[in-house]
A protein has these predicted regions:
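Long, His/Glu/Asp-enriched segments that create or flank divalent metal/ion-associated functional microenvironments
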Residues: 615-641, 645-674, 678-679
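Short sequence/structural segments immediately N-terminal
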Residues: 51-67, 151, 157, 319-326, ...
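Primarily short, surface-exposed interaction patches in extracytoplasmic proteins
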Residues: 250-324, 332-623, 666-667, 687-745, ...
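Solvent-exposed helix-loop boundary motif
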Residues: 47-139, 155-183, 191-255, 280, ...
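Short, positively charged and aromatic/hydrophobic N-terminal segments
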Residues: 3-4, 13, 19
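Cysteine-centered motifs
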Residues: 2, 22, 32-33
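Periplasmic/extracellular electron-transfer cofactor-ligation site
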Residues: 61-84, 143, 147-156, 410-426, ...
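Bacterial N-terminal signal peptides
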Residues: 30-42
Length: 762
C-alpha cells in the first residue's frame, strides 16, 4: 500500500508490499482526480455560469495571451494589447469586445470570432495554437461570446483566496508524479475547483507539469510549482527522492536547533549529512567567513594541535572579538549601502564607512542600525548615516533599496505594473515610496570634476525634510499617502515624522519579515547560500528551502535583540556549518538543504588579503595608507575611477569587487574569467608579492631555515595544513634541482597561491 501523511505534507513511498501495488494505487488516485476534473467541465462551460473575470480572464492567462512575451507586452502584439497578466480586467474587456468595432468577437456566430480562430490556429497566428477546438478553454470563450460577451454583474463574487494541495510533497522513487489541485474561495463564501483554469510555472527543469497540474519527475531534486489564478498565486514544493533501498539514517548529533531542523528535513529526503570537516579545513573556513582573513601558520598549527573538545567554540568566540570582524562585516554593509565616492565624495565615504564599522564594533543591534539609517538627516559629514539618502536620491530608489535591503522584498516590477510574481501592486509601490517623498537636499558646496555628470558631488550636503514633496500614482496622478508594506496596520494620520513611524514599524519585533531578511543574509554570508535564495527575494512563490529553520532563526534573532555576533556564533557552532564540503553518495545532488558545505571562490578582498597574508607582504592601493588590507578600503574610487589604479586596485576590480551602484548583493561577482587566470599566474600583483624583499620567503632565508621548515611554513601559511608526504617530496625535489634557492621557493609559493585549495573556500 502507499503511505500518505496529510494533505499538506505528503510523503508517498512503496512499503513492503512492493512497487506494483503502490503504483497501482497511485494511478487510481490520479485517474480519479482526472475523472473528477473532466466531470466538472460541462458544468463550468455552461453559458449562464461563465463570467469574464473568473472564467475568461483565467483562460487568457493559461493560454499565455496576456504574458509579457505576447499581448501583455507594453506595446501589445499584432495591434492587440492586453493588460499584463490580467491586472486590468475592465480594460481587457473593452479591448476584446468593444474596441475596433468589436472585430475580435462575433456575437451572432461565436465560432467565427477572431479570438477563437486565432487561438486555435484556424487562421494565421504568430503565437501559434494556444488550445484546441472543443477544449475547456475553447468552450468557455465560445459560451461567453455566444452570450453576448457581457461584462460581469456588479454583484459578482470576488476572488479572496487560493489554496493548493498538496503544498509540500516528498515522493520516494519509484513514485514519480503528483497531481496538484487548486481551490479558489470567493467573497460570497463559495469555493470552486479551478485546477483546469490555473497557470502552472516551474522553478527549474527537474520536473514537468501538465496543463491539468500533473507534476512528473525528470530527475531527483526539489522543485517549486507556482500556481496562479487571476491576481493570486501560491507555491507547491515537491521533492523527488531516489529510492536508496539501503538507506539508513545515521543519527547525527545536533549541537543546537539549527542541526535539529536541518536533520529533520534530511531524514525525510533519505539523505545523510556529510561528516564534520577536519580541523585544518574548519579553521581556514571560520577565519575567512567570520573575519575575512587566513589564520597565520602559528594560529593554524596551535588549533590543529589543541586537544580540547570545545576548541571550535573557543575559536569562534575569539574571532568575534577581533578587530578584523568589524572590517569584514563593515565591508559587506558598505557594498549594500552604496558607499562610493561619485555621489558621496571621498570625505563622505570615509565618514560613512567609519560609522558602519563603529556600529559593528560596538555591537549595535541590527534593528537600531537600520533605524538610524531610515531616520537619518542633517549633514552627511557630521551625521554619516544620512549618506544612505545622499546615495539614494529619489523617492522610488529609496523605497526600492529599503524594501530590498531590509525587508527582502524586490519592488522594482511594481513601479510600472502589478508585480507578476509577488503580491505587490502599483498602489503598494507608490504608497511605500510616499514615506520617502519629503526627503530633500541642501547642497552647501559642490565642486564636481565633471560638471556634465549630474550625479557627481564633491562637497557637503544636508539631508532635510520638505513636506511639499509628494509621490503621485502614474495612473491618474493621485497623491499617494504613506502605507506600510503588506500590513493592515498603517501609520496614523498626523504631522509627525513619517520616517520615524516607518523605522519603528520596520524594526519592531512584530515585523518578522525584517528579522527573517536579516538573518537570512547573515546565514548566506556564512553558509554560501541563503535559506531563501536569492537572499533578498522573499515571496510566497520563492519559499525557503527549510521554513521551520528560518522561522526558528528569526525568533532567535529577535530574542537576541538583533545581535549580529550572537547569530554568527549560533550558526558557526552548529554541526551544519562545520560539515565537510565533500558530498556523500546520499547528498551529492543536494544544492539547498545544507547536507554538506558549499564550495565557493574567495571574494576579491579575501583573495588579495589571503595572498598578502600567506606571503606576509603588503599590497599597494591608491588613496589609503600603506599597510591597509583590501577589506579595510572604505570606498571604490581608486578601483573604478582612478586613471592610474595601483596593481591591488586592478586586482580587486578584476576579481569582482562591486562599483556600489545598486543596493544588491548580486552586484558583487564571484564568477571566474580568463583575465583572473592570467592575473594569478603572471600578474603584477602576485609577482610583487613573491619578489618582495621582506616577505615570508626572505624572512625564512635570513633565518636559515631548512627545506622541510620552509615547505611546512608555506603550506601552513597558504592552506592552513601540513604538506602530505607526496607534496613534501615534490617540493624538496624541486628545490634540489634549481640553481637559485629563492627562485625555487617562489615557485612553490606560486603553485600554492594558484591551487584550487587556496582560491576556494571549502
Amino acid at each position: 500500500m502507499c503511505n500518505i501523511i496529510s494533505q499538506d505534507d505528503l510523503i508517498v513511498y512503496p512499503d513492503a508490499g512492493g512497487y506494483n501495488h503502490c503504483m497501482a494505487t497511485f494511478r487510481v488516485i490520479h485517474a480519479c482526480c482526472v475523472l473528477i476534473l473532466l466531470a466538472l467541465l460541462p458544468h463550468v462551460a455552461r453559458a449562464d455560469d461563465v463570467t469574464f473575470r473568473n472564467h475568461v480572464m483565467p483562460i487568457l492567462a493559461k493560454a499565455g495571451c496576456n504574458s509579457g512575451a505576447c499581448h501583455g507586452n507594453m506595446n501589445g502584439k499584432g495591434g492587440f494589447k492586453l493588460s499584463l497578466r490580467g491586472e486590468s480586467p475592465a480594460l481587457d474587456l473593452e479591448t476584446i469586445s468593444r474596441s475596433q468595432l468589436g472585430r475580435r468577437v462575433n456575437l451572432t456566430d461565436a465560432v467565427d470570432s477572431l479570438l477563437l480562430r486565432k487561438a486555435t490556429a484556424s487562421i494565421a497566428h504568430e503565437g501559434g495554437k494556444r488550445f484546441a477546438v472543443g477544449s475547456l478553454e475553447y468552450q468557455t470563450l465560445h459560451d461567453w461570446i455566444a452570450a453576448g460577451a457581457p461584462d460581469d454583474n456588479t454583484a459578482l463574487a470576488k476572488l479572496t483566496s487560493l489554496e493548493v494541495s498538496p503544498r509540500e510533497s516528498i515522493l520516494i522513487e519509484p513514485i514519480a508524479s503528483v497531481q496538484l489541485r487548486a481551490m479558489a474561495t470567493f467573497s460570497d463564501g463559495t469555493k470552486r475547483d479551478v485546477t483546469s483554469y490555473v497557470v502552472f510555472d516551474l522553478s527549474n527543469l527537474l520536473a514537468t507539469v501538465s496543463a491539468q497540474g500533473l507534476v512528473e519527475r525528470v530527475k531527483p531534486g526539489e522543485v517549486t510549482v507556482t500556481v496562479r489564478f487571476n491576481h493570486l498565486q501560491q507555491p507547491a514544493r515537491i521533492a523527488f527522492v531516489p529510492a536508496r533501498p539501503n538507506f539508513k539514517w545515521s543519527e547525527p548529533a545536533a549541537a543546537n536547533f539549527i542541526d535539529e531542523h536541518v536533520h529533520t528535513k534530511l531524514k525525510k529526503l533519505r539523505m545523510n549529512p556529510s561528516p564534520l570537516a577536519d580541523d585544518s579545513t574548519f579553521i581556514r573556513r571560520a577565519f575567512l567567513d567570520v573575519i575575512g582573513v587566513l589564520p597565520t601558520p602559528d594560529e593554524a598549527r596551535a588549533f590543529v594541535a589543541d586537544s580540547r573538545i570545545d576548541k571550535r567554540d573557543r575559536l569562534i568566540n575569539a574571532l568575534l572579538e577581533r578587530p578584523e570582524f568589524n572590517d569584514h562585516w563593515a565591508l559587506k554593509w558598505s557594498d549594500l549601502l552604496r558607499n562610493e565616492e561619485r555621489v558621496l565624495d571621498a570625505k563622505g565615504v570615509r565618514a560613512f564607512h567609519g560609522w558602519i564599522r563603529d556600529s559593528i564594533a560596538t555591537n549595535k543591534p541590527v534593528s537600531q542600525f537600520v533605524h538610524d539609517l531610515i531616520t537619518a538627516r542633517g549633514s552627511t559629514y557630521d551625521n554619516p548615516a544620512a549618506n544612505f539618502y545622499r546615495a539614494n536620491r529619489s523617492a522610488d530608489v529609496r523605497a526600492e533599496a529599503t524594501a530590498q535591503l531590509f525587508l527582502g522584498t524586490r519592488m522594482q516590477c511594481a513601479k510600472c505594473h502589478n508585480h507578476p510574481y509577488d503580491r505587490w501592486t502599483q498602489n503598494d509601490y507608490y504608497s511605500f515610496a510616499a514615506f520617502f517623498a519629503p526627503i530633500d537636499y541642501k547642497i552647501i558646496e559642490n565642486n564636481p570634476r565633471d560638471e556634465n555628470d549630474k550625479m557627481m558631488f564633491i562637497g557637503e550636503q544636508l539631508v532635510v525634510m520638505n513636506s511639499k514633496n509628494q509621490v503621485k500614482h502614474p495612473d491618474g496622478g493621485r497623491v499617494m499617502k504613506p502605507a506600510f508594506l503588506g500590513d493592515a496596520k498603517q501609520p496614523a494620520e498626523s504631522k509627525g515624522d513619517s520616517l520615524e513611524s516607518l523605522a519603528q514599524w520596520m524594526t519592531s519585533g512584530e515585523n518578522k519579515r525584517f528579522a527573517a531578511a536579516q538573518i537570512n543574509r547573515i546565514w548566506f554570508h556564512l553558509m554560501s547560500k541563503g535559506i531563501v535564495d536569492p537572499i533578498d527575494d522573499f515571496r510566497d512563490t520563492n519559499p525557503p528551502s527549510n521554513g521551520p529553520l528560518l522561522d526558528a532563526l528569526t525568533r532567535a534573532f529577535i530574542k537576541s535583540n538583533y545581535d549580529l555576533r550572537a547569530m554568527v556564533k549560533l550558526i558557526c557552532t552548529s554541526r551544519t556549518y562545520q560539515r565537510a564540503s565533500q558530498p556523500t553518495a546520499d547528498n551529492e545532488e543536494d544544492q539547498s538543504n545544507f547536507s554538506h558545505a558549499f564550495v565557493r571562490r574567495l571574494t576579491a578582498e579575501q583573495m588579495l588579503d589571503a595572498m598578502s597574508g600567506a606571503l606576509d607582504a603588503p599590497v599597494a592601493f591608491n588613496g589609503v595608507p600603506r599597510g591597509y588590507r583590501a577589506a579595510q578600503i572604505p570606498g571604490v574610487a581608486a578601483i573604478y575611477r582612478d586613471r592610474d589604479p595601483a596593481p591591488g586596485d586592478r586586482f580587486l576590480r578584476l576579481f569582482g569587487k562591486p562599483p556600489r551602484l545598486v543596493a544588491c548583493e548580486c552586484e558583487r561577482s564571484n564568477d571566474t574569467a580568463l583575465g583572473q587566470v592570467f592575473e594569478l599566474t603572471s600578474g603584477e600583483t602576485i609577482n610583487d608579492l613573491l619578489t618582495h624583499d621582506d616577505n615570508r620567503i626572505a624572512q625564512m632565508l635570513r633565518e636559515k631555515k631548512n627545506d622541510d621548515q620552509i615547505i611546512d611554513e608555506l603550506y601552513w601559511a597558504a592552506l592552513s595544513r601540513a604538506p602530505s608526504e607526496t607534496e613534501r617530496g615534490a617540493a624538496k625535489s624541486l628545490l634540489a634541482n634549481v640553481k637559485d634557492r629563492r627562485t625555487g621557493i617562489e615557485d612553490i609559493a606560486w603553485g600554492l597561491l594558484n591551487a584550487k585549495e587556496f582560491v576556494l573556500r571549502r
